[in-house]
Structures are given as structure tokens and as C-alpha cells.
Amino acid sequence: MTRLHAFNREQLLASARGELFGTAAGRLPNDPMLMFDRITDIREDGGPHGKGMVRAELDIRPDLWFFGCHFIGDPVMPGCLGLDAMWQLTGFFLTWLGAPGKGRALGCGEVKFTGQVLPEAKLVRYEIDISRVINRKLVMAQSDARMYVDDREIYSARDLRVGLFTETGSF
């Protein structure tokens, strides 16, 4: 089977429903927690570590759900949502590789916020660079990531970790 190297919003939402890779595969969150509109490129051997990479985008609109509640009179995208998008994309990479299980964020080494996403912004871009993949009893990916708003880097994270688990009852 040939793997796709880009995904539109409908395909990403199909992943949330278990229709893209099957019901045993990891799923992306559904709206409103899906934090990107498209994956523009995903590769098994790309990125600076040569272990894989994902590139994705989110169109910014003033009517996005989080601007109405965070904060009233001072709308800004919560930083944790950008960080969660990085975990979502790292987990999607594992599922795209064909690993089974439910995705869970396992932590990160370092996170830096040096800017913000305001309603007047146009585009958020994510760059995820996979640094390690373990595919044994434990299925896990580790990545370094950056988030840009209108081509300005505003978030970075090192050593993001996501695992896929076939049983989550004791997690």
C-alpha cells in the first residue's frame, strides 16, 4: 500500500472517527481539539535527524472557539493548544507508519513560548522533526518541534514523546 504524504481536513477528521487507518489505529482528536487543518508533508526519512518529519498548517480566523473564551477582551490562542498540536502530529506520524494503538502524550523535555497567536494572524505552521522511533513492545516517537505564526517562530519544544498503547486501562 502506498502511503499518502499529505492530508486534508476531511481526511484528518476521518482519522478522528477511526476511518482513515482503521479502528485499531491511533486517532486524532475531533473538532474542536484538532489543532491543524492539513498536513502538507509527512516523510519517514526526512528532517534533520533523518528519522521522519511532519509539516502541518492551521488557518487562523477570528471566530475560532478559543478566542471567545481565552481571554475575554484579550483574545489569544492558549499556548497549550499549540503544544498539543505538536503531540497530535507526533502521534499521527506513528499511526501513519502503521503502528497500532491509542496515542498518549508522554511528556517533553523543554518548551519555549516567545510569541502569541492573535485573531488577526493568518496562518500557523508546525514543523515536527522525529528524532527517535521505538517500535517494539513499546511504540513511541520522540520529536523536536517548532510552531510559526505568519512565518515567525513563536514556540519550540524538544524531546516531545508520544506512545501508542493497545491497552490503556492501567495507563
From Swiss-Prot:
Pathway of action: Lipid metabolism; fatty acid biosynthesis
UniProtKB keywords: Cytoplasm, Fatty acid biosynthesis, Fatty acid metabolism, Isomerase, Lipid biosynthesis, Lipid metabolism, Lyase
Listed InterPro entries: FabA, FabA_FabZ, HotDog_dom_sf
Biological process, per Gene Ontology: unsaturated fatty acid biosynthetic process
Cellular component, GO annotation: cytoplasm
MF-aspect GO terms: (3R)-hydroxyacyl-[acyl-carrier-protein] dehydratase activity; trans-2-decenoyl-acyl-carrier-protein isomerase activity
Main location: cytoplasm
Residues annotated as the enzyme's active site: 70
EC number of the protein: 4.2.1.59, 5.3.3.14
Catalyzed reaction equations: a (3R)-hydroxyacyl-[ACP] = a (2E)-enoyl-[ACP] + H2O; (3R)-hydroxydecanoyl-[ACP] = (2E)-decenoyl-[ACP] + H2O; (2E)-decenoyl-[ACP] = (3Z)-decenoyl-[ACP]
Compartments reported by the entry: Cytoplasm
Family: Belongs to the thioester dehydratase family. FabA subfamily.
PANTHER family, sorted: 3-HYDROXYACYL-[ACYL-CARRIER-PROTEIN] DEHYDRATASE (PTHR30272), 3-HYDROXYDECANOYL-[ACYL-CARRIER-PROTEIN] DEHYDRATASE (PTHR30272:SF8)
Oligomer and partners: Homodimer.
Free-text function comment from the UniProt entry: Necessary for the introduction of cis unsaturation into fatty acids. Catalyzes the dehydration of (3R)-3-hydroxydecanoyl-ACP to E-(2)-decenoyl-ACP and then its isomerization to Z-(3)-decenoyl-ACP. Can catalyze the dehydratase reaction for beta-hydroxyacyl-ACPs with saturated chain lengths up to 16:0, being most active on intermediate chain length.
Protein's UniProt name: 3-hydroxydecanoyl-[acyl-carrier-protein] dehydratase
Organism: Stenotrophomonas maltophilia (strain K279a)
